[in-house]
UniProtKB/Swiss-Prot annotation:
HAMAP family xrefs: PurH
Gene Ontology MF annotations: IMP cyclohydrolase activity; phosphoribosylaminoimidazolecarboxamide formyltransferase activity
Family per similarity comment: Belongs to the PurH family.
Protein name per its UniProtKB record: Bifunctional purine biosynthesis protein PurH
Pathway the protein contributes to: Purine metabolism; IMP biosynthesis via de novo pathway; 5-formamido-1-(5-phospho-D-ribosyl)imidazole-4-carboxamide from 5-amino-1-(5-phospho-D-ribosyl)imidazole-4-carboxamide (10-formyl THF route): step 1/1; Purine metabolism; IMP biosynthesis via de novo pathway; IMP from 5-formamido-1-(5-phospho-D-ribosyl)imidazole-4-carboxamide: step 1/1
PANTHER family: BIFUNCTIONAL PURINE BIOSYNTHESIS PROTEIN ATIC, BIFUNCTIONAL PURINE BIOSYNTHESIS PROTEIN PURH
Native organism: Ruminiclostridium cellulolyticum (strain ATCC 35319 / DSM 5812 / JCM 6584 / H10) (Clostridium cellulolyticum)
Matching PROSITE patterns: MGS (PS51855)
Catalytic activity: (6R)-10-formyltetrahydrofolate + 5-amino-1-(5-phospho-beta-D-ribosyl)imidazole-4-carboxamide = 5-formamido-1-(5-phospho-D-ribosyl)imidazole-4-carboxamide + (6S)-5,6,7,8-tetrahydrofolate; IMP + H2O = 5-formamido-1-(5-phospho-D-ribosyl)imidazole-4-carboxamide
Domain MGS-like stretches: 1-145
Enzyme Commission numbers on file: 2.1.2.3, 3.5.4.10
Keywords: Hydrolase, Multifunctional enzyme, Purine biosynthesis, Transferase
Gene3D superfamilies assigned: 3.40.140.20, Methylglyoxal synthase-like domain
Length: 514
């Protein structure tokens, strides 16, 4: 039976109503600081925590509840005769319910440009200590950390006169989930502030649920989408959905790939993605021409794909997009006329991502789950170092060819390895992704390109182990190649390029993607 409740909250949503309901059941209310003032102002009888401890709040409120009379009252096991004897001798009364939420550390650090001192002052000490104590003794203490639980707890109390052990256990779980999340945010903030710890000895990560899903990659798999706290605003979790049904697991995965690729480009660019691989990319002076280039790259594969643009979608572009079925269009904005066109189709999802061009931090973690472990690396934010670029052939690429080579390298960087991309006139004309050798994606991309390969350029995500890719490129009429270099047989590929009059540039930077 709940006789005494301790309330100390920073988020006062619904707390007066909840405390009033407790008081109406004859439950004694103990409180601290601002919470006590708010409850008293609402006409509730409140016992100040100082009256319980016999010790005043001090150090600007840093010490309020860190006292044996509080924690013994929380941790005493009611069925343990020795415990109950001890607290009686010590003059301690039990506390049966704790309602606490913590100092707003997350909200403080997310404001931007926060001073370290302010962040530190918003690290709660007494709150987590009481929460953990109450949760540890869940058999005897109901502990509430989430205002969303007020209603259910009251309903149960109204029906049965108490809170069941089953409910207390679930509430205790939420406490440890919450304090773990809270502490992880603090540790990450301090690590980021230090700035010299790339990979800590123990890695704690914390995310917040963004969306439940009907299923995962396949219908028999359960799934959910979590968002990173404080992530760059130019990433998918910050997108606003303007139209269409909720995004699926595969939608999110593919859209993320499209967003990451379109960030590589400064000029107006449209990216089309299927199964996380680009199937059409085009850059131009305006977004309409960029879309047409992306579409014409591969009019077959773009069907049912994801489209990402780094400029506002206008009505003219929307009309072209509407001629085919696409799953998603993500862009920094849409004109009203464009929305009127695109929303004619109920199955297309429209996402507005205002800061889609924002770069991803080079310090961001790129993680891959493996069975029993986690691979963590820094995000692949570089394309190449300008000083490492070198033409290794007799023939030098023209200015236009060099622009296309850089364009193609941006695309192949975001294509599953082993990958080859062909480009001409700032549009892809053939993409060969995800093969177990290098000659097959070369042939695949050439087959996609057809006659368009004449005069085109080629990009490879890794070095050529043999000269066979150059031979195939020459036969297709390709005039320039860009690749990392680094093979023990580089000279064979260089000799083949010289034989056929092909320019070849080494970047010195590999871009495997798995």
């Amino acid at each position: 039976m709940i006789k005494r409740a301790l309330i100390s909250v920073s988020d006062k949503t619904g707390i007066v109503e909840f405390a009033s309901a407790l008081a109406s059941k004859g439950i004694e209310i103990i409180s601290t600081g601002g919470t006590a003032k708010a409850l008293s102002a609402a006409g509730l009888k409140v016992i100040n925590i100082s009256d319980i401890t016999g010790f005043p709040e001090c150090l600007d409120g840093r010490v309020k509840t860190l006292h044996p009379k509080v924690h013994a009252g929380l941790l005493a096991i009611r069925s343990n005769e020795e415990h109950m004897k001890q607290i009686k001798e010590l003059g301690v009364e039990t506390i049966d319910m704790v309602i606490i939420n913590l100092y707003p550390f997350k909200q403080t650090i997310l404001k931007g440009n926060v001073e370290l001192e302010e962040a530190i002052e918003n690290i709660d000490i007494g709150g987590p200590t009481m929460l953990r104590a109450a949760a540890k003794n869940y058999q005897d203490v109901a502990v509430i950390v989430d205002p969303a639980d007020y209603k259910n707890v009251l309903n149960e109390m109204n029906e049965s006169g108490d809170v069941s052990v089953k409910t207390k256990f679930r509430l205790a779980y939420k406490v440890f989930e919450h304090t773990s999340h809270y502490d992880t945010l603090i540790a990450k903030y301090l690590r980021d502030t230090l700035g010299d710890i790339d990979f800590p000895e123990t890695l704690s990560l914390t995310y917040e649920k963004a969306q439940d899903m009907r299923y995962g990659e396949n219908p028999h798999q359960k799934a959910v989408f979590y968002k990173e706290v404080g992530a760059n605003t130019g990433l998918l979790p910050s997108a606003v959905q303007l139209h269409g049904k909720e995004l699926s697991f595969n939608n999110i995965n593919d859209t993320n790939g499209a967003i990451e690729l379109v960030k590589e480009f400064d000029e107006p660019t449209v990216v089309a993605v299927k199964h996380t691989n680009p199937c059409g990319v085009g850059s131009a002076d305006n977004i309409y021409d960029a879309y047409m280039r992306a579409y014409e790259s591969d009019p077959v594969s773009i069907f049912g794909g994801i489209i990402a643009a780094n400029r506002e979608i206008d009505a003219k572009t929307a009309e072209e997009i509407n001629k085919i079925f696409v799953e998603i269009v993500v862009a920094p904005s849409f004109t009203e006329d464009a929305l009127a066109v695109l929303t004619q189709k109920k199955n297309v999802r429209l996402l507005k991502l205002e800061n889609i061009t924002d770069e991803i931090s080079p310090d961001a973690y790129d993680m891959k789950k493996v069975a029993g472990g986690l691979l963590v690396q820094k995000y692949n934010s570089q394309l190449f170092n300008q000083e490492d670029l070198k033409c290794v052939t007799d023939v030098q690429p023209t200015k236009e060819q060099m622009e296309d080579l850089v364009f193609a390298m941006k695309v192949v960087k975001h294509t599953k390895s082993n990958a080859i991309t062909l480009a001409k006139g700032k549009m892809t004309i053939g993409v060969g992704p995800g093969q177990t050798n290098r000659i097959v994606p070369t042939k695949v991309s050439i087959e996609y390109a057809g006659e368009r390969s004449q005069g085109a350029v080629m990009a490879s995500d890794a070095y050529f182990p043999f000269s066979d890719c150059v031979e195939a490129a020459a036969a297709a009429g390709i005039k320039a190649i860009i690749q990392p270099g680094g093979s023990i047989r580089d000279q064979e590929s260089i000799d083949a390029c010289n034989k056929y009059g092909i320019a070849m540039v080494f970047t010195g930077m590999r871009h495997f993607k798995h």
